Each structure stands twice: as C-alpha cells, then as structure tokens.
Amino acid sequence: IYSQISAFNESIILVDTLLGISLDKYMGEDYPLYKRFYYDYQCASMRPERIVPDCFSFYLLSRYGLNYHEGTCLVDLMMHSGKINYVVQHLLGYEDIGQVMGCKKNEKDIWEYICANDHLHARDPMVIRYYMKPAPTVDMLGGQAPALIGSWVGARIIASYMKKHKDLKIKDLLELTDYQNMFEESGYLKL
C-alpha cells in the first residue's frame, strides 16, 4: 500500500499487488484548493472517511468488472454497481447516509419513475448517464434525488436478491453476472 500525490487525477490506483491512495483526493470537502477545480457535488466525496470504501470498491471493480457490450442495459449497470456497493457496505458495516437520505422514504416513487419512463431496460447512453454518472442531483423527486441513484437502486435490488438467497456467499454473489435473472429472482418489483 502506497500513498501518493496525484495532482488531483486518480483517487485509487491498483496495479498487480500494489495499491496507491492519492491523499490529495481525500483532504476533506472544504479543502480550499478543491474549489478551484471541482464542483461542490464532486468535493462531497473527497473526504478521508471515503478512503477505505473507495479502496474496496476499486479493488472489487478491478476483479469483477462488467463485461459491457451492446446489449447491456440500465438494469445491468445498476445491479453491477449496486452489487459492488452492497458488498462494500456489507464488509464494512456502513451505509452512506448522504446517499440514502430521502431515498428510502421515496424508494417506491423512485422505482415508479424508472418504470413509468420505461428506463429499466434502456440502452440509450443519455438515459444511462442520468442514473449512473456523478451530477449535483437528478431531476427526480423535485430535484432532490442524489446523483448516482441508479447505483443505490441497484444495491437495493441486490439486497432483495440476497434476502431470498441467504446461503449465497459474497464471493459467489460477486461472480454472478446474469443480472436479468437476478432481477427477476429478487422480487424487487413487489415493493
């Protein structure tokens, strides 16, 4: 494990057996220099307490990447990202409160929005970006939904799946990639 200064480029770098943590990306969201280069919503994740979850997430993504192809749709991406988040939360025993605030109480509305707009199986990059890329907020729930809401919904679907597959080990979960089947087995539609 190495610490490094990356000139604000990469947060975590993984190469073979080396892990590099760019300390300059975790100086706290109020770090004055960040204001010159980043938007407030980007600075929110640049806190020291994000180092360990980010290390786990980057490691898992490097080991269990998504085989992205032309047929990959929003639910596949949500569940893949959600699976990584679910595992990290499970291993570290935490929940990102900032991400969850408002989501749990509005979960049904969020799901209805996705379904009503026929986005679940969307392959359009703009639709996918809406749910999966960092932004100040998502224009849903009166603009109060956090960015990356697709990842949060994906983690909720994975949690539903795991409730029905209590004997499934984390390693086995990470190796699963048939997201359409997992989605159907999750029972998540039955909020």
Segments from the language model and where they lie:
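A cross-kingdom marker for long, charged
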Residues: V75, M79-L191
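Acidic/His-rich structured neighborhood in mature extracellular/periplasmic domains
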Residues: I1-M101, K171, E175-L176
